[in-house]
Design a protein with these regions (language model features):
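Non-heme di-metal
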Residues: 1-320
Length: 320
């Protein structure tokens, strides 16, 4: 009989990177509900109104990008999969992007009033810089070639997020908002894998192109990065001028733009290196998460639930 639909066989791996990425992503699975965000309320109350406004806006911007990535971005990459295991990896990535987007709402519900949350989302959905970068990336997702879509995704994952990530990492380095920053570190850990994996898949396709097409795509890629960086400069100035961090954030952005290019197998564009980035922020960007005492659940790492034996009555839900 002719095969209508094929079952995925994880014992016949075509690309070992698919398997290793799947294992990495599933090993580091997490949910925002396991982070004790309310422990940051004392720190939050001590921040100035200007700082609170900044935190709300950067997380609003990050929510927008993660929403787009979970709804449009990963779906756009599926059309060019090489193996069934790659599709499984994208399923995981798409779900975790939704977890990331939801995590910011958990932060808002802990730190902000209902009115403040509404203001944050109104600002997010109307900010010209945010809407511009969403439009640039999403138009590529909708109309670009398979390789162009991968470039857009890596630029989003490894570059555009970092204007927002700077704030919680800076506070973490100053011993503030440690649990909020723990969520950001978990997100960064995921995005690091996403960017590397999608960049690897890009390189497979790029290396199959004739040299002339490679040069044309490289020119397009660097032009896109310039366009995104120019918009990101304006976004950064609008957010950070009030607290005096603008130039430090721009340095951080340029450093991560180079990392995005490296994920794509390309040469760096900017002269900035890790040595140029604020060391407090670089220390926070480590993709390890904080330690915690499992038995007493002390600390700001990922908390596991207490284990209890099941009893007969536990199976009676909905039957009373």
């Amino acid at each position: 009989m002719e095969t209508y639909y094929k079952a995925i066989n994880w014992n016949a791996i075509e690309d070992v990177i698919d398997k290793s990425t799947w294992e990495k992503l599933t090993e580091q699975f997490w949910l925002d509900t396991r982070i004790p965000l309310s422990n940051d309320l004392d720190d939050w109350r001590k921040l100035s109104n200007k700082e609170k406004d900044l935190v709300g806006k950067v997380f609003g911007g990050l929510t927008l990008l993660d929403t787009m990535q979970s709804e449009t971005g990963v779906q756009a990459l599926r059309a060019d999969i090489r193996t069934p295991h790659e599709e499984a990896v994208f399923n995981n990535i798409q779900f975790m992007e939704s977890v990331h987007a939801k995590s910011y709402s958990s932060i808002f519900s802990t730190l902000n009033t209902k009115a403040e949350i509404e203001e944050i989302f109104e600002w997010t959905n109307t900010n010209p810089y945010l809407q511009r970068k969403a439009e640039i990336i999403n138009e590529i997702y909708l109309n670009g070639s398979p390789l162009e879509k991968k470039v857009a995704s890596v630029f989003l994952e490894t570059f555009l997020f970092y204007s927002g990530f700077f704030t919680p990492l800076y506070y973490l380095g100053n011993n503030k908002l440690a649990n909020v920053a723990e969520i950001i570190k978990l997100i960064i850990r995921d995005e690091s894998v996403h960017g590397t994996y999608i960049g690897y898949k890009f390189q497979l396709g790029f290396n199959e192109l004739p040299e002339e097409e490679q040069e044309k795509l490289k020119e397009w890629m660097y032009d896109l990065l310039y366009t995104l960086y120019e918009n990101e400069e304006g976004y950064t100035e609008s957010l950070y001028d009030g607290v005096g961090w603008t130039e430090e954030v721009k340095t951080f952005l340029r450093y991560n733009a180079n990392k995005a290019l490296m994920n794509l197998g390309q040469d760096p564009l900017f002269p900035d290196s890790a040595d140029d980035v604020n060391p407090i922020v670089m220390n926070g960007i480590s993709t390890g998460t904080s330690n915690h005492d499992f038995f007493s659940q002390v600390g700001n790492g990922y908390l596991l639930g207490e284990v209890e034996a099941m009893q007969d009555k536990d199976y009676n839900y909905g039957l009373d």
